[in-house]
Structure formats: C-alpha cells, structure tokens
Amino acid sequence: IYISSGTWSLMGIERKTPDCSLKSCELNFTNEGGYEGRFRYIKNIMGLWMIQSVRHEVNDRYSFAEICAMAEEAKDFPSRVDANDECFLSPENMTEEVKDYCRRTGQQVPETMGEIATVIYTSLAECYAKAAKELEELTGRTYSRIHVVGGGSNAGYLNELTAKATGKEVHA
C-alpha cells in the first residue's frame, strides 16, 4: 500500500486490472491509468490540508516539525474528528471547525495547538486505517507495509500513528 501524502492523501495500490465493482464505487476507490497499462487503485483522503490551515491561522508561527512535536506532547488527548467530513473542506477557520466538531459530537474540546494537532493527526491515521482495511477487503489481500511518499512523509508523528492504527510497517 502507498500513501502519497501532502495537502491531500492518495492511498492505494498499483494493479494490473481495474476494479469497477459497485462496492469499490461505494467506498470511493478509483482507477487511474498508469505506466505500462497498470492502474493506480486509490482513494482520495483528507491529507495535511487541515494542519496546513491551522498553521496558517497562526500566521505560520510554527514549523510543521514543531507542530508534530506539540501534537506528540498532547498524544493522550482523546478527541477525534471524521477528517473526511465536508465541514473540513473549506471552513472559514479550521481551528474553530475542529473545536466545533468536537463540541457537536460531545467530545473534549481541544484548546492548545498541540491538542488540535493531535486530534487532526490521530484522526488522519484512523482514516488511513479504515481505508487500508477497505482496500484489503476489496482486493482479498493482506498488506504488511505502507510506503509514504510526498511532503507528508516528513510528518514522523503521523507516520507513527499510522503504523499504530493500521498495525502495518510504515516506511517514509
């Protein structure tokens, strides 16, 4: 399995034949033509757009590495969001949208940058785990590794969370 991790995340596999099944369509997997007649069988998942937005809201005061470190310090914060929820596509204020989502769903509301970041990173890792499980169900195969490429491959904490959530080795 690979994740092309950036503003958006593309998660999937490369295969020789497309999967045009109803189940594949229902789970939002797509087939993109690739090199030598292969297909990239992928799912588009919210990526680091949420973290990028939160960072911009504080005038880029922190580097992505600093945000990762703050998130790791707040790793026990319990709240989660559905990172693919439409409310996160283009909110007026991502920080407030994350807080509002937690409030609406009866969860603890994050207050610090670290808490907000850990909610986002953990929620993304859980989205990746769900997509990996769907991919395995659709293909009838089990995958032991996830290869992360792109700018998000530098988000060490997210990669650790992804390994934990999926039970797979993550190589970035």
Question: Where are each of the predicted segments found?
Answer:
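Small/polar loops that bind or transfer phosphate-bearing groups
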Residues: 150
